[in-house]
Design a protein with these regions (language model features):
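N-terminal auxiliary segments of SAM/dcSAM-dependent transferases
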Residues: 1-74
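SAM-dependent Rossmann-like transferase core, predominantly class I methyltransferases
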Residues: 51-121
């Protein structure tokens, strides 16, 4: 099956299951399945996937459609320009926390020594 077809099929499954960003999630999961970046997916829509990659993608789509977060499926999440390993034993960094950091950095000078504790917000 071609990249464009499997990507659309995956996005349709996620959309039917009320996943908020179905196409983006499908792209991320496909990228993880074939171990190629998003650019490769966009530039090679007619590339035929190997069965092993298709099977991995389908398994990830099945888990995602049940509501499992993408970060847990791919075991990584970017936060504050860094990539972190994620699994079910840790909380997923949220964009709201990045916003808080940005606001704090606007208020305090770079020379200010801060100590911050974020307890499961």
């Amino acid at each position: 099956m071609k990249i464009e077809n499997i990507l659309n099929k995956g996005a349709d499954i996620l959309k039917a299951n009320k996943i908020v960003n179905p196409f983006l999630d499908a792209e991320i999961l496909l990228s993880e399945s074939i171990k190629k970046n998003k650019k490769h997916i966009i530039l090679n829509p007619t590339e035929v996937l190997k069965r092993q990659h298709l099977n991995k993608f389908n398994k990830l789509i099945e888990r995602r459609k049940k509501g499992e977060p993408v970060a847990y499926l791919i075991n990584k999440k970017e936060f504050w320009k860094n990539e972190f390993y994620i699994n079910k034993d840790v909380l997923i960094p949220r964009p709201d926390s990045e916003l808080i950091i940005e606001q704090v950095l606007k208020i305090y000078s770079k020379d200010t020594q801060l100590q911050v504790l974020d307890v499961g917000t």
